[in-house]
Amino acid sequence: MASLDRVKVLVLGDSGVGKSSLVHLLCQNQVLGNPSWTVGCSVDVRLHEYREGTPEEKTYYTELWDVGGSVGSASSVKSTRAVFYNAVNGIILVHDLTNKKSSQNLYRWSLEALNRDLQPMGVLVTNGDYDREQFADNQIPLLVIGTKLDQIPEAKRNEVLTRTAFLAEDFNAEEINLDCTNTRCLAAGSSNAVKLSRFFDKVIEKRYPREGNLIPGFSDRKRFGGGNFKSLHYD
């Protein structure tokens, strides 16, 4: 079998939001029975069919890098974590729908990864406000995923989803809200599956540009440069 081209996607978010469960669901199509804290970084692989069902269909390795730790970590921890931010092609920002703070912290996570050589300035996360200029030059495709949808009472679900909807707009990204304990939430043909496929297609088109497929407004980002990993762990 010929070697497959690959893309690297970071999975970022506070500890405990369900990143490991999400990655396992995306890569194995199974519920993770006993999730544990990620130390350093855990990498798993999902095979993605680019433009499935079209003449351009092609299989790619999508490496999902689940980065552990807290956004409020000491500078030494952040410096160590920065090694995982090299050669990134896409970012999945994960927050817990039952934890408002985890939603607000996505701004810090994104800035830490996108501006890893800079000190974030003008960012306020106490009430969800932030400086849009920080994201004006972002050229990395983003996807926002809210987890633990099953833990929100039906009566409060609309209120919570309305509160978190601004995240997708702020990051100029699509939004998926799901329950990582239910494999049907990403069933083929569902709106969630379509959004996920569309995101991976964008990541691939950015990494391997094709004439007429360039993402509008995106250009080469020098800070991020351009295998087959399977459940590797970096401590």
Curated annotation (Swiss-Prot):
Region labeled Small GTPase-like — which residues? 1-235
Which domain of life does this protein belong to?
Eukaryota
Xref: SMART domains:
RAB (SM00175)
Binding annotation for GTP: G16, V17, G18, K19, S20, S21, K148, L149, D150, D179, C180
Q: Which Pfam families match?
A: Roc (PF08477)
Which keywords are on file for this protein?
Answer: GTP-binding, Nucleotide-binding
Q: Does the keyword GTP-binding apply?
A: yes
One GO BP annotation of this record: T cell differentiation in thymus
Gene Ontology molecular function, alphabetical: GTP binding; protein homodimerization activity
PANTHER family (alphabetical): DRAB5-RELATED
Family, as annotated: Belongs to the small GTPase superfamily. Rab family.
The record describes the protein's role as:
Required for KRAS signaling regulation and modulation of cell proliferation. Regulator of KRAS prenylation, and probably prenylation of other small GTPases. Required for lymphocyte development and function. Not required for myeloid cell development.
Subunit organization:
Homodimer.
Put simply, this protein is called: Rab-like protein 3
Instruction: Supply the source organism for this entry.
Output: Xenopus laevis (African clawed frog)
